[in-house]
Swiss-Prot record:
Record note on quaternary structure: Interacts with calmodulin (CaM).
Compositionally biased residues, Basic and acidic residues: 12-22
Residues covered by region (Calmodulin-binding): 5-84
Keyword Nucleus: yes
InterPro entries in alphabetical order: Calmod_bind_C, Calmod_bind_M, Calmodulin_bind_N, CBP60
UniProt-recorded Gene Ontology molecular function terms: calmodulin binding; DNA binding
Function: Transcription activator that binds DNA in a sequence-specific manner, likely 5'-GAAATTTTGG-3', to promote the expression of target genes.
Protein name: Calmodulin-binding protein 60 F
Cell compartments where the protein resides: Nucleus
GO-annotated cellular components: nucleus
Organism: Arabidopsis thaliana (Mouse-ear cress)
Region spans: Disordered: 1-22
Chain spans, region DNA-binding: 154-273
Length: 562
C-alpha cells in the first residue's frame, strides 16, 4: 500500500511539474559552462598560490624596514647627540662627493665617475661651504660602503649614523663582498680620491635595483657621512652591449640610445648603409625626415628624441667641407664634420650662421639646399682655419653675383704675387696663418712705399673710386689724435701716407721739420732704428686693414637668387 501511495505521489508531482510554465521550470547548467567555470576557479587558485609568497616577502621587508626606522628614531630621541654634527670648534662638518656617477657600471670593471673621471670626496663646513683644510678632521680616514639606492634623503638633511648604516648593503649568502679593492681613503687637507674599486655582484637582486657609494669616518670624529647618486651595476657580459656617453664618431650606430644591437632598428640602419654614429649624424643633418621614415613606427617619437639627443652629444672632429658656388672659389658654403651648416665664405670673409641677418639666412638656406642636392660637388675644405679669416660684421650684405667672377679672377691673380716686407713673405698661405697681415700683395707693396712717401700712379688710379671723402675724413681724424701725433713725433714716421696733399692728414712744414730733426738725432743708434722700423710696419698694417675694411663696405654686394 505504501508503494502504491508513493507511486501515486510521484505521479502527482510529475503531473504538477508538467503543468508549470516553461519560465518557472528549473534549468540545468550546460556542460560547457560547467567546464569553463571549473577552469576559472582552478586558474584563480593557481594565481593566488603563486602571488602569495611574493606578497608575503614584500610585506615582511616593509614591516622590518618600518620597525628598524622606528627603533632608530627612538634611539635618536633618547640620545644626547645634537641634530647637527658639530666639530671640535662647533663647525658643522660634512662629507661630500664632488664627482657624479655614471648611470651604469659593470661587475669586474673599475669604479669610475662620469666619463671615466676619478671619484673625489671633500670635507666641508656646511655653515660656510668651505673645505676644511686644517685641523685633525682634515686628515681623517674614511670607510667606503655600498648603500641601497632607496636612500633618498637629501644632502642638506641631517641623519644619524645608525640611519645611514641601516641602508648599507651586505653581500648575498655564499657570495664574495660586493665591493673589493681599496675600501679605505684618507683625506688630506680636506680632499680625498677613491682608489681602485670593483663590484663583484650586480644590483638587480635588491628592490631598487640600484646601488650608491657611501663614505663614513673610520674614527670617532663627528662628521656626517656622504653618498653618491644611485646607479645600476650590471654583469660584465652586458659591457659588450653598453652605450657610450658620449659616443664617438667611429662608434657603431647601436651604441646610441634606443637602438639595440642586432635589433630591428639596427638592421634597418645597416640595410641603408648607416653603420656608424658619424653616418647617422650626417644623414640626420642632410635629410632628417628620410631617417625618421627609415626607422618607421618601430621607434616612437620619444625614442627618436632620446636617440637624436644622445647622438648630438658626440665630440666632433675638426674636418670641414665646402661647397663652392662659383669657379673662382671665392664664395662657399661651409659644413662641419657631420654636414651641419656652419656659415658662408664670401670675398675672403667668413660669416657664421649665427651672424647672418634675415635676408642672408634666406639666401643661405637656398645654397645649403643646393649643396645637399649636389653633395658630390662638395669637397673637403683645404685645411685653412676659419677663425683666421676676417669676420664680416656688417660690410657684406649678401652673396656676390656670379657676374663678378671676372673681377674675382683678377683679384685672385693679384693675391698670388710674392712680396716681402722686412723679411716676412706675403704669400696667401702665410696670410691665413697671421690674421693681422691678411692684405693683398698690392697693398703690402704700398706699405713699403710709405717710408719714402711715394705711391705708384697705377695704384692710386686703380683705387680712386675706393678712397672717397668719407675715408679721407676718417683717416684725418685718426692721424690728428693726440696719441697718433705723439707716436709719430716720437719715432719719426713720415707724414706722407700715399697722398701728395699733405694737408689732408694735418701735417705742417714746421711739424715735418721737427720729425726730421728727431729722426736724425736717433739715426745713429742701431737698436732705435730697428724699433722704429717695426713700429712703422705695425702702423702701416693697421692702416691697411682699416682701408681694406672700408673698401669692402663700399663694394657692391647685390645678388639675385631664383
Amino acid at each position: 500500500m505504501e508503494n502504491s501511495m508513493n507511486n501515486r505521489g510521484h505521479g502527482h508531482n510529475q503531473e504538477h511539474a508538467d503543468n508549470l510554465p516553461e519560465s518557472k521550470r528549473q534549468k540545468l547548467p550546460a556542460l560547457a559552462s560547467v567546464i569553463v567555470e571549473a577552469v576559472k576557479v582552478d586558474s584563480l587558485q593557481r594565481l593566488c598560490s603563486s602571488l602569495e609568497p611574493l606578497f608575503r616577502r614584500i610585506v615582511s621587508e616593509e614591516v622590518e624596514r618600518a620597525i628598524s626606522r622606528l627603533e632608530n628614531s627612538k634611539s635618536t630621541s633618547r640620545s644626547t647627540e645634537p641634530n647637527k654634527i658639530q666639530g671640535l670648534d662647533g663647525r658643522n662638518l660634512q662629507l661630500r662627493f664632488r664627482t657624479r656617477m655614471p648611470p651604469h657600471l659593470f661587475t669586474g670593471g673599475k669604479v669610475e665617475g662620469e666619463q671615466g673621471s676619478a671619484i673625489h670626496v671633500v670635507l666641508i663646513d656646511a655653515n660656510t661651504g668651505n673645505v676644511i683644510q686644517t685641523g685633525e678632521e682634515s686628515m681623517t680616514k674614511l670607510n667606503i660602503v655600498v648603500l641601497d639606492g632607496d636612500f633618498n634623503d637629501e644632502d642638506d638633511k641631517d641623519w644619524t649614523r645608525e640611519h645611514f648604516e641601516s641602508f648599507e648593503v651586505k653581500e648575498r649568502e655564499g657570495k664574495r663582498p660586493i665591493l673589493t679593492g681599496d675600501r679605505h681613503v684618507i683625506i688630506k687637507e680636506g680632499v680625498g680620491t677613491l682608489g681602485k674599486l670593483t663590484f663583484t655582484d650586480n644590483s638587480s637582486w635588491i628592490r631598487s635595483r640600484k646601488f650608491r657609494l657611501g663614505v663614513k669616518p673610520a674614527t670617532g670624529f663627528h662628521i656626517r657621512e656622504a653618498k653618491t647618486e644611485p646607479f645600476a651595476v650590471k654583469d660584465h657580459r652586458g659591457e659588450l652591449y653598453k652605450k657610450h656617453y658620449p659616443p664617438v664618431l667611429h662608434d657603431e650606430v647601436w651604441r646610441l640610445d634606443k637602438i639595440a644591437k642586432d635589433g630591428a632598428l639596427h638592421k634597418k640602419l645597416l640595410k641603408s648603409n648607416i653603420v656608424t654614429v658619424e653616418d647617422f649624424l650626417q644623414i640626420l643633418m642632410k635629410d632628417p625626415q628620410k631617417l625618421r621614415s627609415l626607422l618607421g613606427s618601430g621607434m616612437s617619437n620619444r625614442m627618436w628624441d632620446n636617440t637624436v639627443e644622445h647622438a648630438k652629444t658626440c665630440v666632433l672632429g675638426g674636418k670641414l667641407y665646402a661647397y663652392y658656388t662659383d669657379q673662382t672659389h671665392q664664395t662657399a658654403v661651409v659644413f662641419n664634420h657631420i654636414y651641419e651648416f656652419q656659415g658662408l665664405i664670401a670675398n675672403g670673409h667668413f660669416l657664421s650662421s649665427e651672424s647672418l641677418n634675415h635676408d642672408q639666412k634666406i639666401s643661405a638656406d637656398t645654397l645649403v639646399k643646393t649643396a645637399y642636392e649636389n653633395w658630390h660637388k662638395v669637397v673637403e675644405y683645404g685645411g685653412k682655419l676659419l677663425n683666421c679669416l676676417p669676420v664680416a660684421k656688417k660690410g657684406i650684405k649678401s652673396l656676390p653675383e656670379p657676374k663678378m667672377a671676372q673681377n674675382h679672377q683678377t683679384q685672385q691673380k693679384a693675391l698670388q704675387c710674392q712680396q716681402t716686407v722686412n723679411g716676412y713673405s706675403s704669400d696667401p698661405q702665410h696670410l691665413i696663418e697671421y690674421p693681422f697681415v691678411q692684405q693683398p700683395c698690392y697693398q703690402l707693396r704700398d706699405y713699403t712705399s710709405m717710408e719714402s712717401s711715394s705711391v705708384s700712379g697705377s695704384y692710386n688710379g686703380g683705387l680712386e673710386d675706393i678712397f672717397t671723402e668719407e675715408i679721407r675724413a676718417r683717416s684725418s681724424e685718426m692721424l690728428e689724435t693726440d696719441n697718433m701725433q705723439r707716436l709719430l713725433k716720437t719715432f719719426g714716421i713720415s707724414g706722407g701716407f700715399g697722398n701728395r696733399d699733405e694737408s689732408i692728414y694735418g701735417f705742417s712744414d714746421q711739424y715735418e721739420a721737427q720729425i726730421d730733426k728727431g729722426y736724425m738725432r736717433e739715426g745713429g743708434r742701431g737698436a732705435g732704428k730697428a724699433v722704429v722700423g717695426w713700429l712703422k710696419l705695425k702702423a702701416a698694417l693697421r692702416w691697411g686693414i682699416f682701408i681694406r675694411k672700408k673698401a669692402a663696405e663700399r663694394r657692391p654686394q647685390i645678388v639675385e637668387i631664383d
